[in-house]
C-alpha cells in the first residue's frame, strides 16, 4: 500500500491491518504437539514458534531474511543539557554505523541480519518540546515515511533501533503522555547522567507535557509533540511490518516508547511484536507491563541501537529451528507419550 501522508491516514491504515493466519497458527500448534519431546518441554520456545507461524502464514516456517533498521535523529531538547554527550555524537555514531564499528553491526552480523542506518535531517534538530511541538504534522509524517519505506517487503523478521542524543528524555515524555503518572516514573540515566541530570530530565518532561496538552489525549499527537524523528521512523517501520505480517522484535526503552504509541492509538497494533529484552532504564519494565509483554532477555543493556532486539533474533531462530526442523514421533519412529 502507499505510504500514508497524514496522521489520520496512518492511524486508518494501522486499524485496517489484518491479524495472524488462524489456520497456520492452528497447524503450528498441531505440529508442536507431535514433535519428539514431552509436551511443553521447550517452554516459551514453543509459544514463540506458534506465534511466528501465525504471522507468517506458514505452519512450518523458516527465518531466512531478518532485517535490522537503525534510525538517527537530533533533538532540540538536547540543548537543555539532558544528556552526558553533545548532539554532534549522533552524526559521529552514524558514521560509525556506516563503517561497521558499532555494537549493532556486530550483533546484526552474528544474527545473519541485513542492517542499515537511516539518518533523518540531523543538521536540523526537532524543536525544543518545552517551547511547543517538537514536529509539525508534515514533519512527523516525513519521519514516519522514512521508517515505513525502509522496511524490506521480503523480510521475515524486523528489529528497529535508534541513535539520538537526548532521545531518552523524548521517550520519557512520550511514555508519560501515554500512561500518566509523574515524570520521575519515566525518566532514567540514559547515557549516564547523575541524580541532578535525572531531576533535570524530569523537569523538562513536565514542562513539555504542560506546553503540549494535546499529547495526553491523542497518542499520535504525543509522538508529534514530544517525540523525535527517529521515534517516528521506528513507529512507521513497526506499523508497516504489522500490515505486511512481518514479526517484530522490540528493542529497549526508546523503541518501546515509539511502539507504545501504536498500541495506544490502535488496540492490537503490537500483536506482531515481542519484547527482545528488558532495558536497564528503570521505566522500561513499567512500559512493558502496560503493553502486556515479557522480555526474552534480561542483560542490563541500555545501549539502544537495536542491540537487545538483535541479540534476541537468535532466541527466535532457535524456536523456529526446533519447530520446523525436529521430527515428529511418527517420522522418527518413536512411541508418543
From Swiss-Prot:
Pfam families: DBI_PRT. Keywords: Cobalamin biosynthesis, Glycosyltransferase, Transferase. Catalyzes the synthesis of alpha-ribazole-5'-phosphate from nicotinate mononucleotide (NAMN) and 5,6-dimethylbenzimidazole (DMB). One of its GO terms (biological process) is cobalamin biosynthetic process. It is an enzyme of class 2 (transferase). It comes from Jannaschia sp. (strain CCS1). Its EC number is 2.4.2.21. GO terms for molecular function: nicotinate-nucleotide-dimethylbenzimidazole phosphoribosyltransferase activity. Pathway: Nucleoside biosynthesis; alpha-ribazole biosynthesis; alpha-ribazole from 5,6-dimethylbenzimidazole: step 1/2. This is Nicotinate-nucleotide--dimethylbenzimidazole phosphoribosyltransferase. Signal peptide: none annotated. The active site is at 305 (proton acceptor). It catalyses: 5,6-dimethylbenzimidazole + nicotinate beta-D-ribonucleotide = alpha-ribazole 5'-phosphate + nicotinate + H(+). Belongs to the CobT family.
Amino acid at each position: 500500500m502507499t505510504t500514508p501522508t497524514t496522521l489520520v491516514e496512518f492511524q486508518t491504515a494501522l486499524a485496517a491491518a489484518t491479524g495472524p493466519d488462524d489456520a497456520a497458527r492452528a497447524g503450528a500448534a498441531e505440529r508442536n504437539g507431535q514433535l519428539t519431546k514431552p509436551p511443553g518441554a521447550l517452554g516459551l520456545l514453543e509459544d514463540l514458534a506458534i506465534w511466528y507461524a501465525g504471522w507468517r502464514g506458514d505452519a512450518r516456517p523458516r527465518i531466512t531474511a531478518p532485517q535490522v533498521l537503525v534510525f538517527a535523529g537530533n533533538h532540540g531538547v538536547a540543548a537543555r543539557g539532558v544528556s552526558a554527550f553533545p548532539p554532534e555524537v549522533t552524526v559521529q555514531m552514524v558514521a560509525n554505523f556506516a563503517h561497521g564499528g558499532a555494537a549493532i553491526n556486530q550483533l546484526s552480523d552474528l544474527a545473519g541480519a541485513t542492517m542499515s542506518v537511516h539518518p533523518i535531517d540531523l543538521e536540523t534538530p526537532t524543536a525544543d518540546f518545552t517551547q511547543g511541538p517538537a514536529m509539525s504534522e508534515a514533519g512527523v509524517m516525513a519521519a514516519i515515511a522514512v521508517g515505513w519505506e525502509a522496511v524490506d517487503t521480503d523480510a521475515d523478521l524486523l528489529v528497529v533501533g535508534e541513535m539520538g542524543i537526548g532521545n531518552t528524555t523524548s521517550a520519557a515524555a512520550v511514555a508519560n503522555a501515554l500512561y500518566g503518572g509523574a515524570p520521575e516514573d519515566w525518566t532514567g540515566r540514559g547515557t549516564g547522567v547523575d541524580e541532578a541530570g535525572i531531576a533535570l530530565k524530569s523537569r523538562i518532561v513536565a514542562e513539555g507535557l504542560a506546553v503540549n496538552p494535546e499529547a495526553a489525549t491523542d497518542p499520535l499527537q504525543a509522538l508529534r509533540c514530544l517525540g523525535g524523528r527517529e521515534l517516528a521512523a521506528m513507529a512507521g517501520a513497526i506499523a508497516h511490518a504489522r500490515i505486511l505480517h512481518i514479526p517484530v522484535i522490540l528493542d529497549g526503552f526508546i523503541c518501546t516508547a515509539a511502539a507504545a504509541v501504536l498500541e495506544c492509538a490502535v488496540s492490537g497494533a503490537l500483536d506482531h511484536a515481542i519484547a527482545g529484552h528488558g532495558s536497564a532504564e528503570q521505566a522500561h519494565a513499567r512500559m512493558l507491563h502496560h503493553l502486556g509483554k515479557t522480555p526474552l532477555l534480561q542483560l542490563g543493556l541500555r545501549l539502544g541501537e537495536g542491540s537487545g532486539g538483535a541479540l534476541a533474533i537468535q532466541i527466535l531462530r532457535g524456536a523456529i529451528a526446533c519447530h520446523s526442523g525436529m521430527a515428529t514421533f511418527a517420522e522418527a519412529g518413536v512411541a508418543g507419550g
